[in-house]
């Protein structure tokens, strides 16, 4: 029996490693429409296969180097038990993250109070979503239709999307216009670009092909009745009072592109006290926004909350915190606020562990 288990174990492991190596070598020869599905599938298999093994080795090593001496009888009980827990528990957690966690949408309800908010906008409801990465859904429209229904039931005044509509390609958008056009808001829908929307993570036959792909992605927003803000702004009026909405192109620390032009986006709205900024990467807030502007509320995405972490009873942790200072939730510095969403889609690992896909409902409040 042990021999059969060993054979199956090593056959699966060697087969998985071989598949990864072959995919790496043959990647450029694969049709682009199949790459995302294959990469995500292998990514999920790799995580679910090697995480339990690594955890088992770590635990056994700790027991070994702690000089704790087991009797032969104890070893026959403890080691298999550790192996069982270290192997099966993470495996089932990962499987749940892939098949359930990635699509278990959660509504986060946030209030943002600010003294400069006009009285006419007191109670104004904003839906904030980000990082759809539509290619990852592999045209499973019904999965995202559930999110659309949840959003519409919240009856928001306005919807903001803060970038990463696709993974790389415009063809990922095929058929999604019928789904996303159903998103409804009382006073409008606005969007910006994220780093993945520029096609920088793919090889192109020519600069013209990349440019054409980029233009198709931008024009998609017309099909779903979203206004794409490219380093520009709009004003919203209620009862002769107004607030401003500005949106910038992607701005992140290297190696991410810095096409966002904050000064140009705010150029025509300096005299409007309450401004909302859409900026995909939250590092932009610390590097430019709070240094040079008086923007009341900035909305960002990008981090995904790493799609893995702990988020229980108001306490949250994720390894992504060691890369991004502002990685999920509401942050405030004096009179300026930043909200970073955990994202609605996924990229790479096809699942979410402890960081559910997020729909954010932000209610603006007038403060004294």
Residue ranges and their predicted role:
Residues 29, 36, 87, 92-94, ...:
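Short, well-ordered helical secondary-structure segments
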Residues 70, 74, 106-112, 131:
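Low-complexity, intrinsically disordered or weakly predicted helical/coil tracts enriched
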């Amino acid at each position: 029996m042990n021999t059969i288990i060993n054979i199956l174990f090593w056959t699966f492991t060697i087969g998985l490693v071989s598949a990864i190596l072959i995919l790496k070598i043959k990647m450029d020869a694969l049709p682009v429409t199949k790459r995302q599905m294959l990469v995500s599938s292998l990514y999920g298999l790799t995580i679910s296969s090697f995480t339990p093994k690594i955890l088992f080795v770590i635990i056994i090593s700790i027991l070994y180097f702690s000089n704790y001496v087991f009797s032969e009888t104890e070893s026959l009980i403890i080691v298999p038990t550790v192996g069982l827990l270290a192997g099966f528990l993470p495996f089932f957690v990962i499987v749940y993250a892939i098949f359930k966690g990635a699509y278990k949408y959660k509504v986060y309800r946030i209030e943002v109070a600010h003294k400069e908010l006009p009285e006419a906008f007191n109670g104004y409801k904003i839906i904030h979503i980000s990082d759809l990465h539509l290619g990852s859904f592999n045209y499973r429209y019904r999965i995202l239709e559930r999110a659309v229904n949840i959003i519409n039931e919240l009856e928001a005044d306005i919807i903001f999307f803060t970038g990463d509509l696709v993974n790389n390609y415009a063809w990922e958008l095929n058929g999604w216009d019928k789904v996303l056009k159903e998103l409804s808001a009382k006073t409008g829908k606005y969007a910006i670009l994220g780093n993945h929307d520029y096609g920088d993570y793919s090889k192109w036959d020519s600069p013209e092909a990349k440019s054409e792909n980029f233009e198709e992605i931008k024009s998609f927003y017309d099909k779903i009745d979203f206004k794409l803000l490219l380093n520009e702004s709009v004003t919203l009026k209620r009862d002769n009072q107004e607030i401003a909405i500005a949106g910038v192109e992607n701005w992140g620390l290297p190696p991410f592109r810095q096409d966002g032009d904050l000064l140009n986006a705010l150029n025509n709205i300096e005299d409007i006290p309450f401004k909302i900024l859409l900026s995909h990467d939250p590092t932009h807030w610390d590097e430019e926004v709070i240094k040079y502007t008086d923007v009341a509320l900035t909305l960002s995405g990008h981090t995904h909350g790493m799609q893995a972490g702990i988020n229980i009873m108001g306490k949250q942790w994720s390894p992504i915190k060691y890369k991004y200072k502002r990685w999920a939730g509401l942050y405030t510095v004096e009179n300026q606020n930043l909200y970073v969403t955990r994202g609605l889609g996924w990229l790479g690992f096809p699942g979410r562990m402890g960081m559910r896909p997020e729909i954010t409902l932000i209610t603006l409040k007038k403060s004294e």
